């Protein structure tokens, strides 16, 4: 790892359709092999589908889903005298959003269904309703942190 100081974080430009940074970040997560236009098509199809199914603004549903999926705490491995402890740590907002998007896209991919856009739309709607695979992952992360609360004093 380089010791030359911190890298400057580049801001994510908002997407052209919804003017949302969150959607732009999701498109980048959905993208495979540099095919951004395909990923954008999948994301916009999913949002259109959400709008039709729920009858409400798809951007609001999506933002609610991400808010529900964002973890507050996570566990990190810390080695102390030959033993490895799972130490609960608070999650920074940027990392929380990144984890939420990662889980959302991962559980959409492994979900049953015909197209990626329909799977993504269903996973987003489930997350907005606090159900689905990604929501289970968030709850599991919180449970792990709660179970290992005794090791919180090893925080670094």
Curated annotation (Swiss-Prot):
Keywords from the named record: Ribonucleoprotein, Ribosomal protein, RNA-binding, rRNA-binding, tRNA-binding
Role played: One of the primary rRNA binding proteins, it binds directly to 16S rRNA where it nucleates assembly of the head domain of the 30S subunit. Is located at the subunit interface close to the decoding center, probably blocks exit of the E-site tRNA.
Sections of the chain in a coiled coil: none
Quaternary organization: Part of the 30S ribosomal subunit. Contacts proteins S9 and S11.
Organism: Rippkaea orientalis (strain PCC 8801 / RF-1)
Family: Belongs to the universal ribosomal protein uS7 family.
Encoding gene (name): rpsG
CDD domains on file: uS7_Chloroplast
Signal peptide: none
Designated name of the protein: Small ribosomal subunit protein uS7
GO biological process, one term: translation
GO cellular component: small ribosomal subunit
InterPro entries, per the entry: Ribosomal_uS7, Ribosomal_uS7_bac/org-type, Ribosomal_uS7_CS, Ribosomal_uS7_dom, Ribosomal_uS7_dom_sf
Domain of life: Bacteria
Pfam families: Ribosomal_S7
A GO molecular-function descriptor: rRNA binding
